[in-house]
């Protein structure tokens, strides 16, 4: 926290993994919170996954970038769990996320990794990235329709090659600043797009992924209201998996440990809000004796 803004490195990556393990409101160790540029790209996935498996007990993620990375990660997860190949494939042990190349395209290396995951029974989240006014129509209806078309195309492909494989649809639809072209997050448009997608994904009967995004540059008031807006849109849409739930800044260009902790406070409050409703009506629950003891006034 005292080292200022800098490029991502392996030490910072490990620090974020320790934060991930510490907070119970974080359930998954997703992608790289920072890109450890001091580790060569050819072996980065091996070192990063090793730290995830040794520093956390959270569900891990593989970047779907072709055969080598995905196969390496699946094998490391299988070995870490002491599993046979049949046991590994019997139920979800990890997951990946792929993004479409809007409009109306999927990148082959991502599809290749996703298909390899699906064939071994591991979940794939398909998340089109559609920005209204950029690579998607400027209307919310058009942007959401485009996102759903791209997501369903990927879902259909995976079900074709591995019928019944676990798949989720993601939403990452927002608007752009029409002056600068920069993505905007935590806006009313982002929230509405998330909720529109949630309604349709429930209709299709598959799980939903959304995100705790913001576009602010520092962990300030703007950062927190944008992230809170995004998180409330997620839970109101009955999201099953929230990406980027803690630590996100500047549209994902910055990972902030300070904001990670601030976001976890918000996540814990939301979790508390969604706990089972209170039906307790006994005298002890209502604290009748305490009320009588204090009396009026």
Model-derived features: where do they sit?
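Glycine-rich phosphate-binding active-site loops on the catalytic face of alpha/beta enzymes
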Residues: 233-254
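Acidic/polar loop patches that form or flank catalytic/metal-binding clefts of enzymes
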Residues: 206-212, 241-246, 276-285
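Helix-rich catalytic cores of soluble enzyme domains
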Residues: 2-240
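Histidine/acidic-residue-rich catalytic or RNA/ligand-binding cores of hydrolases
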Residues: 221-222, 253-257
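Catalytic-core signal marking the mid-to-C-terminal active-site face
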Residues: 258-297
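Charged, low-complexity surface segments at secondary-structure and domain boundaries
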Residues: 2, 61, 254-256, 292-293
């Amino acid at each position: 926290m005292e080292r200022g803004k800098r490029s991502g490195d392996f030490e910072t990556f490990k620090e974020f993994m320790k934060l991930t393990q510490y907070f119970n409101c974080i359930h998954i160790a997703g992608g790289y919170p920072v890109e450890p540029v001091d580790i060569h790209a050819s072996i980065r996935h091996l070192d990063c996954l090793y730290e995830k498996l040794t520093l956390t007990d959270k569900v891990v993620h593989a970047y779907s970038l072709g055969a080598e990375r995905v196969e390496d990660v699946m094998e490391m997860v299988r070995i870490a769990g002491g599993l046979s190949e049949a046991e590994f494939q019997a139920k979800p042990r990890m997951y990946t996320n792929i993004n479409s190349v809007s409009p109306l395209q999927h990148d082959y290396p991502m599809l290749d990794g996703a298909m390899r995951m699906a064939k071994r029974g591991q979940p794939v989240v398909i998340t089109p990235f559609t920005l209204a006014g950029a690579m998607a129509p400027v209307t919310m209806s058009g942007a959401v329709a485009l996102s759903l078309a791209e997501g369903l195309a990927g879902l259909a492909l995976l079900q074709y090659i591995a019928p019944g494989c676990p798949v989720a649809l993601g939403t990452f639809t927002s608007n752009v600043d029409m002056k600068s072209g920069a993505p905007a997050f935590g806006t009313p448009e982002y929230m509405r797009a998330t909720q529109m997608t949630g309604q349709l994904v429930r209709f299709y009967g598959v799980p939903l992924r959304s995100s705790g995004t913001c576009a602010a540059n520092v962990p300030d008031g703007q950062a927190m209201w944008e992230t809170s807006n995004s998180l409330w849109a997620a839970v109101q849409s009955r999201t099953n998996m929230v990406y980027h739930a803690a630590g996100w800044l500047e549209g994902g260009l910055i990972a902030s440990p300070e904001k990670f902790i601030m976001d976890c406070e918000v996540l814990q409050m939301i979790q508390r809000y969604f706990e089972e409703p209170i039906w307790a009506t006994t005298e002890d629950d209502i604290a009748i004796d305490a009320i009588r003891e204090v009396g009026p006034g």
